[in-house]
Amino acid sequence: MLVWIDCEMTGLDLAHDGLIEVAALVTDGQLNVQGEGVDVIIKPEPQWLDHMNDFVRNMHTTSGLLAELDKGLTMAQAQDQVLDYIRTYVPQAGKAPLAGNTIGTDRSFLAKDMPKLESYVHYRNVDVSSIKELARRWYPRAFGHSPEKQGNHRALADIQESIEELMYWREVLMVPSPGPETTRCDEIAAKYQGFLTGAGRD
């Protein structure tokens, strides 16, 4: 399983900003979405809104998120709702990696504002943006034809687009299942083992 999460924040400063929307979708290993997912809006601390710059304020106004914040949940309520959904499909903590786009930023805010949720997922991340950056350098044609994002800056739509993007990268970049024959895998492993470190080479 993979736990896909996207967050909207009042900004990117961990000391002065915070989460205002969190959405989650769980997929199996083949990227099939489990259930309906969850999307929660959080009523922010007043000082977070005061710190919001014009760019972020305009972005959240255009998306409609800013107008919904007054009716948002508390951070604790929001965390519990997201965890309840995840636990339905991932009943054991520390098993499913966190997935998304540029997920390190989201994870940092989750660790600050929703530590129970952040610690529930595996410490490893599946970051679609890493594959995109490699495609940009190694497969420019595939990069140039990747799915166009709508960029509406709402958490659930952003997750759905991230899953769609990984589906695309899997089909255009990844070796079809079940992959190369065992002997071919061994040949390639021998070719690169110690290529830089010298370890394991005669």
From Swiss-Prot:
GO CC terms of this entry: cytoplasm
Cellular localization per UniProt: Cytoplasm
EC top class named in words: hydrolase
Primary residence: cytoplasm
Any Pfam family: RNase_T
Positions annotated as active site in the UniProt record: 123
CDD domains reported in the protein's UniProt record: Orn
EC number: 3.1.15.-
Gene Ontology terms for molecular function: 3'-5'-RNA exonuclease activity; nucleic acid binding
UniProt keywords, alphabetically: Cytoplasm, Exonuclease, Hydrolase, Nuclease
The keyword DNA repair is annotated on this UniProt entry: no
Family per record: Belongs to the oligoribonuclease family.
Task of the protein: 3'-to-5' exoribonuclease specific for small oligoribonucleotides.
PANTHER family per UniProt: OLIGORIBONUCLEASE, MITOCHONDRIAL (PTHR11046:SF0)
Protein name, entry field: Oligoribonuclease
